[in-house]
Amino acid sequence: MALRNGLIPLYVSVVTAVMFGMLAGFSGNVIAAEDSDSAETLSFSYRRLLPLEGGSNFRDLGGYPTDDGGQVKRGLLFRSGAMTGLTDNDQNYLDGFGFKTIVDLRSTEEIELYPNHWARESNIDYLRVPYSIVEMMAKAFEVSEQEDGDGHGGMYDSLLTAIKPQLKLYFEALLQGRAPLVVNCSAGQDRTGVTSALLLASLGVSREHIVEDYLLSTDFRRPLIEAGGVDLQEAAKTNGFAAMMLQYGEGKDPSLPSPLVTADGVPFISATLDGVKEQYGTVNAYLISELGLSDSDLVTLRGLYVN
């Protein structure tokens, strides 16, 4: 698995934020479930984090105010960590929302270890782009080597390039109105955090609220649920992601989520937003330049997902 001598022990520290890394109350319309009675019941069953037995960081992006005086619609846009641990009760509960689409940002190695049973057992479109996490993190490490400090800024910058195909897939699904939709990675905080930040910005949510939403992952994650009881020692014989997680987790408390801020308390997502602003001016300009969206697409997104 080693890409070059000594590489894995070095770059595995960079994988922290990508892999594994209180209730923000809001009002909004009743969620878009297929049955109106079910929708009304479900709308009162949570504020932002969904009450799942085997879920981690599965939450609603709705309710944030937008710059035109609107509010992101509730019950349509969700984000989550790995969903392998969802119980039958969880799946029945989620089916009440009428989910149409799952966009899985994880790698082939991660999905092999932690499959999404709900996607297989429910009538939901499951969208993903196959790639190797080992190769992605090697590229992220090359960027982080050039950064000061812990290298997280470089890693987050590299995410915009690394998951560009997935970002295109996500925004295409949104523009097609394939919601309720949930986007996820392993922890639901880094790849999902960047993806969600871009969406919220495109809908006119302030940077303050975007960062606020990003930081909620520290409280909402359940790392032991995400771990899924997998024997990493055995899995590491054939799975590069398992080997990486063994190295990263050595000597650490597996029940604690990794922090999402620098030693100085600056959220990692801030570097990404700063980089986008510096290079493109706005997130919308980035979406147009890099993901191929048009001005009319941005208007469509607001029409679909903002009250």
Kindly give the residue locations of the regions a language model identified.
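Ser/Thr-glycine-rich phosphate-binding loops at phosphate-binding pockets of nucleotides
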Residues: 187-192
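Non-Sec secretion/translocation targeting segments of pathogen effectors
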Residues: 1, 18, 32-34
